[in-house]
């Protein structure tokens, strides 16, 4: 930490009325580009309009103007998010059985959509229990609402209206901070101030206010609900906030007010700030007193973190100093120059943020089932499966986005003349070693992981089960994973004497939590089958990284195309006249990376879905005997490719294939339709531009004959456009197929 004289304070941070509000410009498609604004001559125009509308770099090269457009667009994004949230809460208030579910969450399923009786579609309204007919939802909103202490549909209405107000406010802010008071570039680049505000404000005060809400509103209301009190009898949030005696009846330490806090006698508060570990046996969710404690602790950490950086007062860390001090014995100039990169290239900044947020989203996916945070979430198998799948897909997309923007940074924002011997330059100079080693790792993982399966298929086909890799023949136990599980299972007694259970029941031990006769969570055994599929995960992830990293490291130049940077981020080939140079642009690497990301995530969600149905989810008898949905068949069936096809894909597709004539029939139709969308993508991916141009010209001839030819000349999609349309339908079709398959299955059997 350096103490120096105060830096001169920045006085004027905004420009007033920089861009006049013009409806004429809004009404003109492509007003941001001279070429597009002329209007369409060929059908390529509409594609270019979509490609460039949000590519602010192509509108202007002025960094301040680009920054303002991004900033304004963020408010628009927030507005849409608030609108979406409002819609969710409105559906809960207007069309749902939330109050009925609240009174009996183990026998009544969540529903917030009732289909109108048009041409027989009301068949979709299944019986979710309690006399309510509607579509069963798997978003987890009911569980979140209960955890936050919402007890009536009126409260949901109020929240929905509140979210609408915020949506309007965000729209206004987006307009105001672009047209009326637009921040100067210096404001966007003041990273210390931004860190202080984001850490202390958003994360610190945000967590503190949530912890406050949990303690004063959620905890007491959930106490009442768990005790079986009728939601209509429970005191309202404002009564709990204003009347300390009410809370003191549930949590005696409330009677003492803030005295224990100021006298440092904090253990007094242990009745509502706990450290128990494990799950609440009534709801199958984390102890809400544990999560309140967690948010309070997080708030303290971030409030401290938000006071670490030097702004107008000459005390604290400067980010530039920190980065430039980061030098190792083998890293040359180290992080020198990184500060300039991250304050002038928003693509570089975004790439880092997407990589971290994507990884975090995948971590969230895993925590949602291992440490289910909301009441009655763990026993709602459809929601558990949906939340895992959703967060895995989102994480995958965000990580591919990170590679995309890293490559755009390399092409558009990287200045090789000012970068010498810093970390980035050193990575670029030994990129051949990185990529060739990574390629070797992919080949090794691919052949060995797949080879283990093929061995098992062969032995199985030859009737030699004793020669297979399995828990009952040649064992390949995941010993490191089992060691980690065991360490965590034993941890509470050693590292956290106050805790009664480990962080997650999945680690091991003898604990099993069941709610209403359904398993919430139990220790998850790992064996040979998990060892095999884990190495498939390692393989697919490494291939995805290989493709994406190659795209970034060779975005500016390669031996094949030394001047690649001049061709831009996306180009079809370095031609004409140079064969063998197609599909080398940074954009093409993102395109190819998306397919492998899809492979990676598919294997993960298949593994999760089958493993949970086989070894975790199921019912428990009065004698304590657990019957799993697929009877523990994962360990012996998933060790062959044939087992995956027969006992997972085919066996579990029976529900979606036989859904016609039932309330799940929409999933059957989606299953069919999404397969079609997926197959449609192959038309774009497997045929070239010339084929379609020829066809189009013959169709145009026919139109001319009939004198119905359009003024805008039809053109085949460009190579890049065709691949973009192809990968979009491939992913959309694949994801929707999986969604229909999973939900029809789990709603029918879960």
Curated annotation (Swiss-Prot):
Record-annotated membrane-spanning stretches: 70-93, 156-179, 195-219, 291-309, 346-369, 385-411, 433-455, 531-549, 589-610, 664-686, 724-744
Co-factor binding details: P700 is a chlorophyll a/chlorophyll a' dimer, A0 is one or more chlorophyll a, A1 is one or both phylloquinones and FX is a shared 4Fe-4S iron-sulfur center.
UniProt-annotated location(s): Plastid, Chloroplast thylakoid membrane
InterPro entries, alphabetized: PSI_PsaA, PSI_PsaA/B, PSI_PsaA/B_CS, PSI_PsaA/B_sf
SUPFAM superfamilies linked: Photosystem I subunits PsaA/PsaB
Residues involved in chlorophyll a' binding: 675
Pfam families on file: PsaA_PsaB (PF00223)
Subcellular location, principal: plastid
An example Gene Ontology molecular-function term: 4 iron, 4 sulfur cluster binding
A single GO BP: photosynthesis
Catalytic activity: reduced [plastocyanin] + hnu + oxidized [2Fe-2S]-[ferredoxin] = oxidized [plastocyanin] + reduced [2Fe-2S]-[ferredoxin]
Binding-site list for chlorophyll a: 683, 691
EC number: 1.97.1.12
GO cellular component: chloroplast thylakoid membrane; photosystem I
Superkingdom, natural source: Eukaryota
Membrane topology recorded in Swiss-Prot or TrEMBL: Multi-pass membrane protein
Binding-site list for [4Fe-4S] cluster: 573, 582
Gene3D superfamilies assigned: Photosystem I PsaA/PsaB (1.20.1130.10)
Annotated binding of phylloquinone, by residue: 692
Keywords attached to this entry: 4Fe-4S, Chlorophyll, Chloroplast, Chromophore, Electron transport, Iron, Iron-sulfur, Magnesium, Membrane, Metal-binding, Oxidoreductase, Photosynthesis, Photosystem I, Plastid, Thylakoid, Transmembrane, Transmembrane helix, Transport
Disulfide bonds: none
Family per record: Belongs to the PsaA/PsaB family.
The protein's role, per its UniProt record: PsaA and PsaB bind P700, the primary electron donor of photosystem I (PSI), as well as the electron acceptors A0, A1 and FX. PSI is a plastocyanin-ferredoxin oxidoreductase, converting photonic excitation into a charge separation, which transfers an electron from the donor P700 chlorophyll pair to the spectroscopically characterized acceptors A0, A1, FX, FA and FB in turn. Oxidized P700 is reduced on the lumenal side of the thylakoid membrane by plastocyanin.
Assembly and binders: The PsaA/B heterodimer binds the P700 chlorophyll special pair and subsequent electron acceptors. PSI consists of a core antenna complex that captures photons, and an electron transfer chain that converts photonic excitation into a charge separation. The eukaryotic PSI reaction center is composed of at least 11 subunits.
Protein name per the record: Photosystem I P700 chlorophyll a apoprotein A1
Protein source organism: Spinacia oleracea
Taxonomy of the source species: Eukaryota, Viridiplantae, Streptophyta, Embryophyta, Tracheophyta
């Amino acid at each position: 930490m350096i103490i120096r004289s105060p830096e001169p304070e920045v006085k004027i941070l905004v420009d007033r009325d920089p861009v006049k509000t013009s409806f004429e410009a809004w009404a003109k498609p492509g007003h941001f580009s001279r070429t597009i604004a002329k209007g369409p001559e060929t059908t390529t125009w509409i594609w270019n309009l979509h490609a460039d509308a949000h590519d602010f770099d192509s509108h202007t090269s002025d960094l301040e103007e680009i920054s303002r457009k991004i900033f304004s667009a963020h408010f628009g994004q927030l507005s849409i998010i608030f609108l979406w949230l409002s819609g969710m809460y409105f559906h809960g208030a207007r069309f749902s059985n939330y109050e009925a579910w609240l009174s009996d969450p183990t026998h009544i399923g969540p529903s917030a959509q009732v289909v109108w009786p048009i041409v027989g579609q009301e068949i979709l309204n299944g019986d979710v229990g309690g006399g309510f007919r509607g579509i069963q939802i798997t978003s987890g909103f009911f569980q979140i609402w209960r955890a936050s202490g919402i007890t009536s549909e009126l409260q949901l209405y109020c929240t929905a209206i509140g979210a609408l107000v915020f949506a309007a406010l965000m729209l206004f802010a987006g307009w105001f901070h672009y047209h009326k008071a637009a921040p100067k570039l210096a404001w966007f680049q003041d990273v210390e101030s931004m860190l202080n505000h984001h850490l202390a404000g958003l994360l610190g005060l945000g967590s503190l206010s949530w912890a406050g809400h949990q303690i004063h509103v959620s905890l007491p209301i959930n106490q009442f609900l768990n005790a079986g009190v009728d939601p209509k009898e429970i005191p309202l949030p404002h009564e709990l906030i204003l009347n300390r005696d009410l809370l003191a009846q549930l949590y005696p330490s409330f009677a003492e007010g803030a005295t224990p806090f100021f006298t440092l006698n904090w253990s007094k508060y242990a009745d509502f700030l706990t450290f128990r570990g494990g799950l609440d046996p009534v709801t199958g969710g984390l102890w809400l007193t544990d999560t309140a404690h967690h948010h309070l602790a997080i708030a303290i950490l971030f409030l401290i973190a938000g006071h670490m950086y030097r702004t107008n007062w000459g005390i604290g860390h400067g980010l530039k100093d920190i980065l430039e001090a980061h030098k190792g014995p083998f890293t040359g100039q180290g992080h020198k120059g990184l500060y300039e990169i991250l304050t002038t290239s928003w693509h570089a900044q975004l790439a880092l943020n997407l990589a971290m947020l994507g990884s975090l989203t995948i971590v969230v996916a895993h925590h949602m089932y291992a440490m289910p945070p909301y009441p009655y979430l763990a026993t709602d198998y459809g929601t558990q499966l949906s939340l895992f799948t959703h967060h895995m897909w989102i994480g995958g997309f965000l990580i591919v986005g990170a590679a995309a923007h890293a490559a755009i940074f390399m092409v558009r924002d990287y200045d090789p003349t000012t970068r010498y011997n810093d970390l980035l330059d050193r990575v670029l100079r030994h990129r051949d070693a990185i990529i060739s080693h990574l390629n070797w790792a992919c080949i090794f993982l691919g052949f060995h992981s797949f080879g283990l399966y093929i061995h098992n298929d062969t032995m199985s086909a030859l009737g030699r089960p004793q020669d297979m890799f399995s828990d009952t023949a040649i064992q390949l136990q995941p010993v490191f994973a089992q060691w980690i599980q065991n360490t965590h299972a034993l941890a509470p007694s050693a590292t956290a004497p106050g805790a009664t259970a480990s962080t997650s029941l999945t680690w091991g031990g003898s604990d099993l939590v069941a709610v209403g006769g359904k398993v919430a969570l139990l220790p998850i055994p790992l064996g040979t089958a998990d060892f095999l599929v884990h190495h498939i995960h390692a393989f697919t992830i490494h291939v995805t990284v290989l493709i994406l990293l190659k795209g970034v490291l060779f975005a500016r130049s390669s031996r094949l195309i030394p001047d690649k940077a001049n061709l831009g981020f996306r180009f079809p080939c370095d031609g004409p006249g140079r064969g063998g140079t197609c599909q080398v642009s940074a954009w093409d690497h993102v395109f190819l990376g998306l397919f492998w990301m899809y492979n990676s995530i598919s294997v993960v969600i298949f593994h999760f879905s089958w493993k949970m149905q086989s070894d975790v989810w199921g019912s428990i008898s009065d004698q304590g005997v657990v019957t799993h949905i697929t009877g523990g068949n994962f360990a012996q069936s998933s060790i062959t490719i044939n087992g995956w096809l027969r006992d997972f894909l085919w066996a579990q597709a029976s529900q979606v294939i036989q859904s016609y004539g039932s309330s799940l029939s929409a999933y059957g139709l989606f299953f069919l339709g999404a397969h079609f969308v997926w197959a449609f993508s192959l038309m774009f991916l497997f045929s070239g531009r010339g084929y379609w141009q020829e066809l189009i010209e013959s169709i145009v001839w026919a139109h001319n004959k009939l004198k119905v030819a359009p003024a805008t000349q039809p053109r085949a999609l460009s190579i890049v456009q065709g691949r973009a349309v192809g990968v979009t339908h491939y992913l959309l079709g694949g994801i929707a197929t999986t969604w229909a398959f999973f939900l029809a299955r789990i709603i029918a059997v879960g």
